[in-house]
Amino acid sequence: MKRTYQPSKLVRKRRHGFRARMSTKGGRKVLTARRARGRKRLSA
């Protein structure tokens, strides 16, 4: 059986990166919440 996590830097950036977050309303909400919480890293 193939494992579910097959790492790819490109896919990671595209799906969970900063620009991907900024491109949707919900994503911007995520960044706002992470900033409010004081997260060092906002996105992948």
Curated annotation (Swiss-Prot):
GO terms for molecular function: structural constituent of ribosome. Keywords: Ribonucleoprotein, Ribosomal protein. Residues 1-44 are annotated as: Disordered. The keyword Ribosomal protein applies. The lineage of its organism: Bacteria, Pseudomonadati, Pseudomonadota, Alphaproteobacteria, Hyphomicrobiales. The keyword Protein biosynthesis does not apply. It comes from Rhizobium meliloti (strain 1021) (Ensifer meliloti). This is Large ribosomal subunit protein bL34. HAMAP family: Ribosomal_bL34. It comes from the Bacteria. The gene is rpmH. Gene3D superfamilies: 1.10.287.3980. GO terms for biological process: translation. Residues 10-19, 26-44 have a biased composition (Basic residues).
